[in-house]
Regions:
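Conserved class I S-adenosyl-L-methionine
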Residues: 2-12
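Conserved SAM-binding loop of SAM-dependent methyltransferases across substrates and taxa
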Residues: 11-24
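Conserved SAM-binding motif I beta-strand of class I
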Residues: 27-32
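Conserved SAM/SAH-binding beta-strand->alpha-helix loop
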Residues: 34-36
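Conserved SAM-binding loop
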Residues: 41
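Conserved SAM-binding strand-loop segment of SAM-dependent methyltransferases
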Residues: 44-56
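A short acidic, Gly/Pro-enriched loop at the edge of an enzyme's catalytic core
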Residues: 58-66
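C-terminal substrate-binding/active-site "lid" region of AdoMet-derived donor-dependent transferases
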Residues: 75-126
Length: 126
């Protein structure tokens, strides 16, 4: 992946930092609606931007291969899917412990790896 974006990073950049280590040539970006969280991440060298997934600045996401979110509120998942569809990016969700809200959403692939459950919406499946 050339460009990866975490939506709703908050104050937990651990996955993003690990990705940056594992994929040093990829552009890794964090977004959040909280300007204070974004400022704190910027101070530790994380490329981060204030953005609201309900009114996304699509220029931020252009060219992204993957957009992911860890334990997002269920109401933003359809917004992530819509954004991914518009810009041509895969969407990866690591859900809260309860993942029942995916039962009403179509096209998502459920993946279980070492006990971790993730949902993937591939751009090729839309």
């Amino acid at each position: 992946a050339r460009k990866i974006i975490e939506v709703g990073v908050g104050r937990s950049p651990y996955t993003l930092l690990q990705l940056r280590f594992l994929l040093p040539n990829a552009e890794i970006i964090a977004t959040d609606i909280d300007p204070e969280a974004v400022r704190e991440l910027s101070e530790i060298g994380v490329k981060s931007l204030v953005d609201d997934i309900f009114e996304p600045n699509e220029r931020v996401y252009e060219g992204a291969d993957l957009i992911y979110s860890i334990r997002p509120p269920s109401e933003i998942i359809p917004r992530l899917a819509e954004l991914g569809s518009r810009i041509g990016a895969d969407i990866l969700i690591i859900p809260l412990s309860e993942d029942a809200y995916f039962s009403n959403l179509s096209g998502w692939e459920r993946i279980v790896e070492n006990g971790l459950i993730v949902y993937l919406l591939r751009k090729s499946r839309r």
